[in-house]
Amino acid sequence: MAKSRKSNRDKSKDSNWQERVIQIRRVSKVVKGGKKLSFRAIVVVGNEKGQVGVGVGKAGDVIGAVRKGVADGKKQLIDVSLTKSSSITHVAKGVSGGAKVIVRPAAPGTGVIAGGAVRTVLELAGLKNILAKQLGSNNPLNNARAVINALEGLRTFSEVAQERGVPLEHLYT
């Protein structure tokens, strides 16, 4: 008799999230009867306000794999501290597998200068002025995870001042 209000709440909460598929790949598993085919989707989820996550989903059809990838990406969200010019505070490096990514802050008006999966992650994180370079592997999943690792390593000025135990005004004097 009681109606569920959960569905209305979920729609309003999820409306500001964007999702982009980086890669869809057909994968197979060898079983006794032959090969069992399935699809693997790598999905980036972000709100362009400083939250982003990378998820992987695998299912028998593409739509199911993307849906699982979005759910996985929302479980692995990280917070990125943005500056007033929609950039980052300092240079950061990230590694995942054989992929290495270097991200550098850029002047206002520069735009996102990056390629492939790295560009997608940075755009969905809300970064508008940033430079990035991929080194090593071209694997989209490892590059996406490497840029997530780089963004996790970022610290704000207030965090640095708190770690050093000095007021923010006296940080660089």
UniProtKB/Swiss-Prot annotation:
One of its GO terms (biological process) is translation. InterPro entries: Ribosomal_Su5_D2-typ_SF, Ribosomal_uS5, Ribosomal_uS5_bac-type, Ribosomal_uS5_C, Ribosomal_uS5_N, Ribosomal_uS5_N_CS, Ribsml_uS5_D2-typ_fold_subgr. PROSITE patterns: RIBOSOMAL_S5, S5_DSRBD. GO terms for cellular component: small ribosomal subunit. Keywords: Ribonucleoprotein, Ribosomal protein, RNA-binding, rRNA-binding. GO terms for molecular function: rRNA binding; structural constituent of ribosome. SUPFAM superfamilies: dsRNA-binding domain-like, Ribosomal protein S5 domain 2-like. It comes from the Bacteria. Residues 17-80 form the S5 DRBM domain. Gene3D superfamilies: 3.30.160.20, 3.30.230.10. It holds the Pfam family Ribosomal_S5. With S4 and S12 plays an important role in translational accuracy. The N-terminal domain interacts with the head of the 30S subunit; the C-terminal domain interacts with the body and contacts protein S4. The interaction surface between S4 and S5 is involved in control of translational fidelity. Belongs to the universal ribosomal protein uS5 family. Part of the 30S ribosomal subunit. Contacts proteins S4 and S8. This is Small ribosomal subunit protein uS5. The lineage of its organism: Bacteria, Bacillati, Cyanobacteriota, Cyanophyceae, Oscillatoriophycideae.
